[in-house]
């Protein structure tokens, strides 16, 4: 390894000397001190960045002229000179070839002045050197010396397909798709870019690009002051970006100080405290973010006052307590606890007050939400004498529930007709059953007031059913099609008592032509039927005064009604009625409501003088 080191140094100096004898090498190494560390990339791509020689090269870029890095190199050269000729004898055979085309990139063509610009690539956090050739800007990074291969091959005039194929075959490449146009493309290592430039013979066009210490070209005497300012600004900005990125990682105070001491140890030693001092003060206005940086500085700095002030603004005592806890905890752990503890602490008093208020608002808002529905149906409500119930609903739960017992009887009675016709339509609304209705309705209203408010919306349909429900008790169960359901059981079987069906009987089927045909059928099949009913087939249009006679007569033909209905069906639905005995009607009622609806007009046929209304009352029972 001792021999390997001198040989590398020898090659570096030999390349810099441009073929000069070895003894003048020591002379040229002084003025060329910034070159020696830069040479290894050309000769041995893998080693130069791993060995000690290139590290001064990097420091040389950071500090400018690399005076400290150049110092140790000449000091090593005189001590190693006796060793240099030995490896040089064997190595000089191979070196001139590499060295020959390396000079093309290192030395300017005759009459050409270097034109290099530098820009700070904020996305990558690196300084880029740019060289323009044939109207194309080719950039080279300062940190890893990669070159934009896409722009490089564009300078060569290569087609897009060939260029992309070459760049895709590169093992080491960095694709950039976001950023300035001259920085987009595929970035390749310095050595590969130099090979491509030599093959395409564009190295001279890109002269300053491949100079190892390209940063030194920026320090031209006519341009030195400004370029030094630009480089210093770039370094400061790079450090600021590094410090702004690292704090969220966990322990910024531990990370920044070594970082600064490594990058620029001398003057930057005081920066860590300053850099950490600024972000918390600047960002203290927003509550969640300051703990990320200020938590590490919190015990040492006065920024805790800011946090205490914020905590007090939200909730005085709890905010200060949270900060005290943060000061005692570790810096990394105090960061999340600050926003986690103070906001809940500040929210607790409001939460406790609002939770109770919110519950009361919900209690009072429930009737208010119920009230819109009654309000929309207010006309119907007043028609049926339920205006008082809505006043009680608007009052609030405590007032409506206790007072709803006595007057709500009306409301609940109507509600049973309105929203619960399927439940109570089967039953007669006599005194005892009405009392039961009121009791059950009271249970519903106390349990769910929201449903109670919706009930009146259906009340406009109830009275017709309710007024006729008393007559439904006079109809035989077999006649209604639901013999298995007694009047009391209808409360638990709403499906068999669907509400919409009676409406169709009222409008469509109460006085339909089928009703007219029923007497004809009775006259044709059994002549005694009209006599039993107390009139002929034309009794369908008999005045209501005859209702007293047919009312008692309706009980006799009731069991025979389904057979008669089959005739009313005109034979089209006769098969259904023949296949459906009276005992099967309840089961069939679940599946064939329409057929039952059409079969229900049979009671009018028995009483046809004017008993269409009782059939309506009977229909809810069979439902």
Swiss-Prot record:
Keywords: Conidiation, DNA-binding, Nucleus, Sporulation, Transcription, Transcription regulation. Residues 396-408, 542-553 have a biased composition (Low complexity). It comes from the Eukaryota. InterPro entries: EFG1/Phd1/StuA, HTH_APSES_sf, KilA/APSES_HTH, Tscrpt_reg_HTH_APSES-type. SMART domains: KilA-N. Residues 115-221 form the HTH APSES-type domain. Residues 423-446, 570-579 have a biased composition (Basic and acidic residues). GO terms for cellular component: nucleus. The keyword Transferase does not apply. Residues 13-111, 232-270, 332-623 are annotated as: Disordered. Residues 13-31, 335-374 have a biased composition (Polar residues). Residues 569-594 are annotated as: Nuclear localization domain. It is found in: Nucleus. Residues 149-170 bind DNA. One of its GO terms (biological process) is positive regulation of transcription by RNA polymerase II. PANTHER family: PROTEIN SOK2-RELATED (PTHR47792:SF1). This is Cell pattern formation-associated protein stuA. It comes from Hapsidospora chrysogenum (strain ATCC 11550 / CBS 779.69 / DSM 880 / IAM 14645 / JCM 23072 / IMI 49137) (Acremonium chrysogenum). The gene is stuA.
């Amino acid at each position: 390894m001792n021999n390997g080191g001198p040989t590398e140094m020898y090659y570096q100096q030999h390349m810099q000397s441009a073929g000069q004898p070895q003894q003048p090498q020591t002379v040229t190494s002084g003025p060329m001190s910034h070159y020696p560390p830069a040479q290894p990339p050309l000769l041995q791509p893998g080693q130069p960045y791993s060995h000690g020689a290139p590290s001064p090269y990097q420091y040389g870029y950071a500090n400018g002229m690399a005076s400290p890095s150049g110092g140790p190199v000449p000091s090593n050269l005189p001590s190693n000179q006796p060793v240099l000729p030995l490896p040089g004898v064997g190595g000089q055979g191979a070196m001139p070839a590499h060295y020959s085309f390396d000079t093309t990139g290192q030395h300017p063509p005759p009459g050409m002045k270097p034109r290099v610009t530098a820009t700070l690539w904020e996305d990558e956090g690196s300084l880029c050197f740019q060289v323009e050739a044939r109207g194309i800007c080719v950039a080279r990074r300062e940190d890893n010396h990669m070159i934009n291969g896409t722009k490089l091959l564009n300078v060569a005039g290569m087609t897009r397909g060939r260029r992309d194929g070459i760049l895709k075959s590169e093992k080491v490449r960095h694709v950039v798709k976001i950023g300035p146009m001259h920085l987009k493309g595929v970035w390749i290592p310095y050595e590969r870019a130099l090979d491509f430039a030599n093959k395409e013979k564009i190295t001279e066009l890109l002269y300053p690009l491949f100079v190892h210490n390209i940063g030194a070209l920026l320090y031209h005497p006519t341009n030195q002051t400004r370029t030094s300012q630009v480089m210093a600004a770039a370094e400061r900005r790079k450090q600021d970006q590094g410090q702004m990125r690292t704090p969220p990682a966990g322990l910024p105070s531990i990370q920044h100080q070594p970082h600064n001491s490594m990058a620029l140890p001398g003057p930057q030693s005081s920066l860590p405290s300053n850099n950490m001092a600024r972000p918390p003060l600047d960002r203290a206005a927003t509550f969640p973010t300051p703990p990320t940086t200020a938590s590490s500085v919190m015990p040492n700095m006065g920024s805790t006052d800011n946090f205490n002030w914020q905590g007090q603004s939200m909730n005085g005592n709890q905010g200060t307590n949270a900060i005290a806890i943060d000061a005692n905890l570790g810096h990394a752990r105090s960061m999340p606890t600050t926003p986690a503890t103070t906001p809940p602490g500040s929210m607790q008093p409001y939460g406790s007050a609002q939770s109770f208020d919110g519950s009361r608002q919900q209690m009072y808002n429930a009737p208010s939400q119920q009230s819109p529905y009654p309000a929309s149906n207010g006309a119907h409500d007043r028609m049926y004498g339920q205006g008082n119930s809505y006043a009680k609903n608007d009052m609030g739960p405590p007032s409506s529930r206790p007072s709803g017992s006595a007057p709500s009887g009306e409301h609940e009675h109507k509600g049973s007709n309105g929203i619960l016709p399927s439940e109570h339509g089967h039953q007669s609304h006599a005194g005892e059953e009405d009392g039961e209705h009121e009791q059950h309705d009271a249970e519903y209203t106390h349990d769910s007031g929201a449903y109670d408010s919706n009930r009146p919306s259906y009340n406009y349909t109830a009275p017709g059913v309710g007024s006729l429900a008393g007559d439904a008790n006079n109809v035989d169960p077999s006649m209604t099609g639901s013999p298995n359901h007694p009047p009391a059981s209808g409360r638990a079987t709403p499906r068999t008592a669907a509400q919409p069906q009676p409406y169709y009987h009222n409008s469509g089927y109460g006085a339909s032509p089928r009703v007219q045909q029923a007497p004809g059928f009775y006259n044709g099949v059994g002549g005694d039927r009209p006599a039993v009913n107390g009139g002929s087939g034309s009794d369908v249009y008999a005045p209501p005064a005859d209702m007293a006679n047919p009312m008692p007569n309706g009980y006799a033909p009731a069991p025979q009604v389904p057979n008669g209905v089959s005739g009313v069906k005109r034979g089209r639905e006769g098969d259904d009625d023949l296949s459906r005995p009276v005992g099967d009607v309840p089961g069939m009622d679940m599946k064939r409501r329409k057929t039952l609806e059409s079969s229900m007009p049979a009671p009018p046929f028995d009483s046809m003088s004017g008993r269409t209304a009782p059939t309506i009352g009977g229909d809810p029972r069979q439902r």
